[in-house]
Amino acid sequence: IISIMANNQKMRTESDLLGSVELPADVLYGVQTLRGIENFRISKFHLNEYPLFIKGLAITKLGAAEANHKLGLLTDEKFNAIAQACREIMDGKHHDAFPVDMIQGGAGTTTNMNANEVIANRALEIMGHQYGEYQYCSPNDDVNCAQSTNDAYPTAIHLGMYATHLKLVEHLKQLIESFEKKAAEFADVLKMGRTQLEDAVPMTLGQTFHGFASILRDEIVHLNEAAEDFLTINMGATAIGTGICAEPGYAEPVSYTHLRAHETE
């Protein structure tokens, strides 16, 4: 339902079990996100300040949609619209529609619903419908199909952390390159090596920088090993680990086929 306020701002009405609320007609999020904004004003850090986490959410929703589409749970029209919405978010669009506080009750339910509503409303727009017309594409029944906050949210965190890890390694490699350049530049500059806060034996300044580079190379190896744990996810476990509400044959494709295909995008 679209209404016009006294200041000529268009509003739309959405409802949940607690009642109806009005929100600006042009915002991509919905009633659950609005309730989250009102209920959780805790840290002053908001979801839209963490783009790699939002990207992880979009990748998670895209992987789930691909698996559900192949199982016949999403029509071609719904799937194509949801997939386009997810890819737009992965490309950095619509991040302003994720305003909820990072600290919230419910183990991330508000964040999960924020993503579901944004993707659903953008999908509705792609299909030619109005925001909030969830009978055509539902945040819960379609975007969140076969998922729970308890598997989608930690999966998104893992993917966001893995993307952060890749950026960290990229920057460390640049720093190693800089150290190696300095090692070559100062290869003939003598200095005293020090141990126990005292002068010890001669060495070159270049050797010092070469040592810095070697340490960082070792750290990259350790980081890469640790980051493998981020690729261990629980998608398909749903709410309590039993896979309830997910179709047989959903968990393996969503985890091993679809999410793996998008992990480095």
Descriptions of predicted regions:
Residues 1-4:
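Short, Lys/Arg-enriched N-terminal segments with co-localized hydrophobic residues
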Residues 6-242, 246-256:
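A helix-coil-helix interface module used to build multimeric assemblies
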